[in-house]
Amino acid sequence: MRAAPMSLTILGIESSCDDTAAAILRGPGDDVAILSSVVSSQTDLHAAFGGVVPEIAARAHAETLDLVVEEAMATAGIALSDVDAIAVTAGPGLIGGVLSGVMAAKGLALGLGKPLIGVNHLAGHALTPRLTDGLAFPYLLLLVSGGHCQFLRVEGPERFVRLGGTIDDAPGEAFDKVARLLGLPQPGGPSVERAALAGDATRFKLPRPLLDRPGCDLSFSGLKTAVLRLRDGLVEANGGLTEQDRADICASFQAVVASVLAEKSRRALALGDVTAFAVAGGVAANQVLRAALEEVTDLPFAAPPLALCTDNAAIIAYAGLLAFEGGRVDDMTLSARPRWPLDATAAPMIGSGKKGAKA
């Protein structure tokens, strides 16, 4: 008779951008319970600057990490001594924030005598559909976030094959830029989505980059430029933008992003050898995008709950749990990494990693 999988309790820590997070997760990898997930947002700290300021973010992480860990422990109803291992985002991201998290995790691991597991932040997002929907490997993932956009064949807890990605800006960075151009608050993704609800997505014709080229690569830099020119043309012609102008621009932009990602997803799916299709990352919270992607295939489709799309520590704890079950642990030489590709064998993307707060 086969023994039941061991139940483990993992503390996860996340601090790669502008959210400080801690979570407690328990179970074997195929039967997980999230006991707590605490996220402290820095949105108000960065609002006046129109984007994330790395120095402010790093300082806020250092001041907040202890508090979110304490709250996660209290919510889960456990003590630090009950934790079996500590998983922490070790990259990629803003180096000051990543370093704050890694140092905090090292201190806890050393003081408690617990194993330490460094987690690739992108792996946390990539494995979220398995956490929430139990997808079987291999599945196709569209990882779409503030600093990244790539198609990955997820073959195992630490095995990822990149099929394509953005050659310049990530969609999340493009949403933020469009929001700034239109005077909408940050973060730009939710602001653009809200404004688009009252907009006409057919009013303005915007380019759909790289659809004339084969493959799964994407580009969003030219789309941002097109929105800038559209805005400037309306301002010059009418002396300013009306609320309807803003709504229509947002709706048109959002529709183009969704249609481009949907078409590129069809191409990635045509490569075959996957059991399901999933989307993850912060931009995956966009409902128009989710609806467009769900229509591209008859395979099972997974889009995690909104709270697990944006940055959080539960997905880091889960990735750490799977790595720990696979026998990987790190020691006190674990370093913070500003860049950390999931598919280390793939050639670097043109322009990859140069734009966005989390690049």
UniProtKB/Swiss-Prot annotation:
It comes from the Bacteria. GO terms for cellular component: cytoplasm. The gene is tsaD. The keyword Transferase applies. Belongs to the KAE1 / TsaD family. Required for the formation of a threonylcarbamoyl group on adenosine at position 37 (t(6)A37) in tRNAs that read codons beginning with adenine. Is involved in the transfer of the threonylcarbamoyl moiety of threonylcarbamoyl-AMP (TC-AMP) to the N6 group of A37, together with TsaE and TsaB. TsaD likely plays a direct catalytic role in this reaction. Keywords: Acyltransferase, Cytoplasm, Iron, Metal-binding, Transferase, tRNA processing. This is tRNA N6-adenosine threonylcarbamoyltransferase. Fe cation binds at residues 121, 125, 311. GO terms for biological process: tRNA threonylcarbamoyladenosine modification. Binds 1 Fe(2+) ion per subunit. It catalyses: L-threonylcarbamoyladenylate + adenosine(37) in tRNA = N(6)-L-threonylcarbamoyladenosine(37) in tRNA + AMP + H(+). InterPro entries: ATPase_NBD, Gcp-like_dom, KAE1/TsaD, Peptidase_M22_CS, TsaD. One of its GO terms (molecular function) is N(6)-L-threonylcarbamoyladenine synthase activity. It is found in: Cytoplasm. PROSITE patterns: GLYCOPROTEASE. Its cofactor is Fe(2+). Substrate binds at residues 143-147, 176, 189, 286. Its EC number is 2.3.1.234. Its main location: cytoplasm. The keyword Cytoplasm applies.
